[in-house]
């Protein structure tokens, strides 16, 4: 099963890469740039799962896999972090604020075609589960990207995922990043079954793959 999945990934990656590169060539422009923002890091673990797993670690693992698939498809990728670090200085008195501002500055300086923030969710009721995508409420491009990615969750979660892309006007990066940006909450670490899936290499691969396919669809319809 794993070999078949990897073979299908190889074939589809070649087709997807051809679409992206053909689009860039016809427009005589450089390949599109995507920023992948892996949430938390350093002294900020993010959510802590019922199994003890740390959100910051899962975010980075999924982000790295997503980067691999996107680059294989001809997309230029910038990571806000590629190690267990935050974007703050040890001398910063408010590290969380400094971290968010630094991420925002990096993204705006890059001016990418889009930014995808990788996060994990948590809730006080263990039964709550599912993946959800957030976008800035007045961003038409953000909404379109969020809708595409939200539908991609059906490929990894099936019909059990009844969530819809959700507008937001309070999250710092959604407010201050100038290019299209979405936040992908991959699942709930407070749910035992979902935490186990999110820690599974196979599930991480499938999730990163399907997010990458959603991003390519968005880029190819620009």
Model-derived regions: residue spans:
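Short gly/ser/thr-rich secondary-structure transition/capping motifs
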Residues: 17-18, 96-98, 163-168
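Hydrophobic/aromatic residues positioned on beta-strands within the core alpha/beta folds
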Residues: 37-38, 186
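Active-site-adjacent substrate-binding region
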Residues: 142-167
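Short, charged, low-complexity patches
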Residues: 59, 142, 146, 200, ...
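Catalytic-core regions of hydrolytic enzymes
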Residues: 19-34, 40-145
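Active-site-adjacent mobile loop/cap segments within catalytic or ligand-binding domains
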Residues: 110, 124, 162-222
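Hydrophobic membrane-insertion alpha-helices, especially the h-region
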Residues: 1-14
């Amino acid at each position: 099963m794993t070999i078949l999945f990897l073979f299908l990934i190889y074939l589809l990656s070649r087709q997807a890469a051809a679409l992206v590169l053909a689009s860039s060539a016809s427009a005589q422009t450089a390949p599109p740039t995507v920023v992948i923002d892996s949430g938390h890091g350093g002294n900020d673990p993010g959510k802590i799962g019922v199994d003890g797993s740390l959100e910051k670690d899962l975010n980075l693992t999924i982000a790295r896999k997503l980067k691999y698939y996107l680059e294989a498809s001809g997309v230029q990728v910038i990571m806000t972090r590629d190690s267990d670090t935050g974007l703050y200085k040890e001398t910063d008195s408010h590290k969380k604020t400094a971290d968010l501002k630094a991420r925002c500055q990096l993204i705006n300086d890059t001016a990418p075609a889009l930014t995808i923030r990788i996060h994990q969710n948590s809730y006080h009721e263990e039964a709550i589960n599912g993946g959800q995508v957030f976008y800035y409420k007045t961003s038409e491009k953000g909404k379109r990207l969020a809708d595409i990615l939200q539908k991609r969750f059906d490929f990894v979660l099936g019909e059990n995922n009844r969530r819809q892309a959700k507008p937001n006007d309070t999250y710092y990066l959604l407010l201050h990043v100038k290019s299209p940006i979405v936040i992908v909450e991959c699942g709930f670490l407070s749910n035992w079954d979902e935490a186990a899936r999110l820690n599974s290499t196979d599930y991480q691969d499938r999730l990163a793959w399907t997010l990458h396919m959603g991003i390519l669809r968005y880029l190819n319809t620009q």
